[in-house]
Amino acid sequence: MKLKVFTKNDCPNCPPAKELAQKIENEGKIEVELFNTDEADGLAEAQFYAVLATPSLILCDKNEDEVEAWRGEVPTREEVYKKI
């Protein structure tokens, strides 16, 4: 499983999403990727997953298919782990 976290520079609600991503990554159970939608690569990935708001977190399986998504919100750590 992989958690993709989409943020942007001027997003006031993005710091909690980044903190959650860091905690989850440190636990080592899920791979975490951070994407900044102000950058070309981040924007392209956001378009692929239909991310229209930040922060957004997309949980993907090994084939990069979406399993669960939190668009425009930050889930709790427990909500993420329930979907694994």
Predicted regions: what they are:
Residues 30-42:
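Thiol-based oxidoreductase modules, predominantly thioredoxin-like and allied folds used
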Residues 15, 43-44, 68, 78:
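Alpha-helical elements of the RecA-like P-loop NTPase motor core of helicases
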Residues 59-84:
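Non-catalytic, surface beta->alpha helical segment in thiol-disulfide oxidoreductase systems
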